[in-house]
A protein has these predicted regions:
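A ligand-binding cleft/hinge motif common to bilobed small-molecule-binding domains
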Residues: 94-104, 220-238
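A short, structured surface patch at a secondary-structure boundary
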Residues: 26-92, 98, 192-195
Length: 288
């Protein structure tokens, strides 16, 4: 038995020996997505710790709210168990060995594996609320869902009849977002046509067809970041994007960095943010 394994078992035993509190719930979140879900439905006293990226606005849509809570660092099992959790939240991209170590300690784990659409996000909110086991959490989940639905209905009302703007979401990592991605979901709701799907026929995050892309009629690049020039800069010298008119002319829509890959209900913000930039005329009557 390794020293790390012994420590994990000892911590698990200590957790098990603690006097049971009737309604005590202590939740540790291991990913940014589960941070966002947890902060939406849990009471503050139920949140034991959040992920190591919880306060990073590049990745987290709850960076400011997360400042009130501890973070688990890189979050090995020993660190997670030190927060004496009764429930640990993982995603299906969490390390399998980490999930199993926590599970073997006797702590309940909840793994989220669907986040392609807003309906998936609603289901995840309800699943977490049910795991927390109190009516207040369920009420919070339903309130969040109702708010998202109202905002989405208003967005659809404004965008009714618009001609979709032809877009792509370029990446410096050698892939581009196709169908079955959060970016495609954003496009579907924001009045955008993702050319990686309609012309490239790509699924997931796939290698871009570099030569063929040069013929795509890209109207707008969708980028993530806080500064338009900084977000565009890498693509000015990166083939094939450097040869596209949209890149040379700086035709961009800028989303908050975290919003571009958001896997929770907070993606409604991305829908609204992109729609306002692609179809500003639908908001002109509102004034400044």
């Amino acid at each position: 038995m390794t020293r790390a394994t012994f420590t994990i078992l000892l911590l698990a035993a200590c957790v098990g020996l603690r006097p049971a509190a009737a309604a005590e719930v202590r939740v540790v979140s291991q990913t940014v997505g589960t941070d966002e879900l947890l902060l939406a439905v849990a009471a503050p006293e139920q949140i034991a710790a959040l992920s190591h990226l919880a306060r990073d606005p590049v990745f987290s849509g709850v960076a400011q709210a997360a400042e009130a809570y501890p973070m688990i660092g890189m979050g090995d099992a020993e660190t997670i168990l030190r927060y004496r959790p009764t429930l640990v939240l993982f995603s299906d991209y969490s390390r399998i060995e980490l999930v199993e170590q926590v599970r073997r300690s006797g702590v309940q784990v909840l793994i989220f594996n669907r986040y392609e659409s807003l309906d998936d996000a609603y289901a995840n909110l309800r699943q977490l609320a049910a795991a927390l086991g109190d009516d207040t959490a369920r009420d919070r989940a339903e309130t969040v869902i109702a708010d998202c639905r109202a905002r989405l209905a208003e967005l659809h009302r404004r965008l009714q009849g618009v001609k979709p703007v032809r877009v792509i979401a370029p990446s410096t990592y050698g892939v581009i977002a196709g169908s079955e991605t959060t970016f495609q979901d954003i496009c579907d709701q924001a009045g955008a046509e993702n050319l990686a799907v309609t012309l490239g026929h790509l699924t997931g995050h796939a290698a871009p067809p570099s030569e063929a892309m040069l013929k795509w009629p890209v109207e707008v690049l969708v980028l993530g970041g806080a500064n338009r020039d900084e977000a565009l800069a890498p693509f000015l010298k990166l083939p094939p994007y450097a040869f596209m008119a949209a890149v040379r002319e700086g035709r961009t829509a800028l989303l908050d960095a975290w919003a571009l890959g958001c896997v929770t209900h907070l993606r409604v913000h991305a829908y609204e943010q992109l729609a306002r930039q692609l179809h500003p005329e639908r908001w002109q009557k509102d004034g400044p």
